[in-house]
Amino acid sequence: MQPTVTIKRLGWLAAATIVLGVLIGVGAGLLTLLLYGVEHVLLGYIEGPELPGPFGVPAARRAISVTVGLSIAGIIWYLMRHKTTAVPSVKKAVAGKRMPFWQTIAHVVLQIFIVGSGASIGREVAPRELGAMLAQRFCDLFHIEGVDGIDRRMVVAVAAGAGLGGVYDAPLAGMFFAVEILLVDVTIEKVAFGLGMSAIAAFVAVAIKGHHLFYDITAMQPESTPTLMLFALICGAACGVGGALFRKGSQWAEAHKPTGKAILWQMPLAGLITGLVATVVPQVMGNGRAAAQLGFSTFIPETAGTAGAMQSASSAAASPWNLLTGGGNVSDSASGGGAGSGMASFWAMLQGGNGPSGSVMNAGFPLSQSNIWMLLGVLALTFVAKALVTLMTIRSGASGGVLQPGIALGSTLGAMLGLVWILMFPTDSVTACALIGAASLLSASQQAPLMAMCLVMELSEAPITFFVPVGMAVATSSLISKWLLSRK
């Protein structure tokens, strides 16, 4: 039943859009600053376009940070889940479940804290939960319910989406998250309400935390090609399978979280294992930004001229391929030796050499066709490590999201397929293939093609012409994953 449109109703919708948009934007901006603060204190660096991951942080500090972070969070979550009112999921909040105020605040802060310490899990659930909780209080204050609670559900869902839009400066993705995943109902009213609130939240959040390019895809070809359209179908099919498996895995991990005191040892153990893995694969840490950028930064100079792709010096310096081996100015804030030494030694072992030569750009990881199988190996290692460590973190009892881990898996899988693809079709770039993979695997794992496509395109600020191949891949992956997930 559609609600009746009245001046009074449009008035409170407009008021909710502005008031909640501003409040959620402030919250999203502050949560981002909190993340930066935790990273600075525990890891000695702050993520950004110039440094997408803790590559310049000594291996021992990586391991200690994530172990301590998950240990502290495990204790607090145990007390919260057994001594206070539990915090429901956003979907349950939309359905009417009450979100306790202080418990939700603590729950949200803990999620940001563990991501900042290096835990392999997404941070996007925190601003969504904050938005949903604020929306419930707004509805209580102004007695907003509607017929059978339809207005209240809409406000809570749209506010949760605005949290996503605010924290990532992605208003389209925030709107589609609300109408495609939470409400599963697309109307002009919901789209307008959702887009308005997400846009305001994004604007306010950017005013607090600043605007920074989240994913650097400057090594991508300038235009789409017919062969890239064909790649989109192939990559979409592969990512449909991968996304379905990741969705099943994350659902299994969520369903088997410890319910008692086991969280007190499982979360510290997950932190220790993450830290040990990060000594060799530092890009596994955090919400997935570093792992995803590894795929986006895979640049093969031999085919670049044919594809029309170019990589600037600043982009190459910030490339994980360079940072993994200590090339360039990795970090001014992370003191001590061992920057990237784990992966550098691993690469030297594969080559049978003595590791990177120092500050020469990409010294240990020469990005060329002659080393394509080595590059595939590192991408495959990143893909497997990120998937397993993320599922382990969820299984141990941690709360958080899987959007950014899904993008990371899609980017690395797309880059792997792209490395093989450009041998046959050098007019395409690996970065474009990684972009297609990121959107299509996220779509498959979330069963939300519009949200996934918009989130990846907004985070990367990709040229609008790439909506066509990305859309084709997303459609393919969504259909295949839907079929796989429907099978018993």
Pin down the residues of each PLM region.
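Alpha-helical transmembrane segments and immediately membrane-proximal extracytoplasmic
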Residues: M1-K488
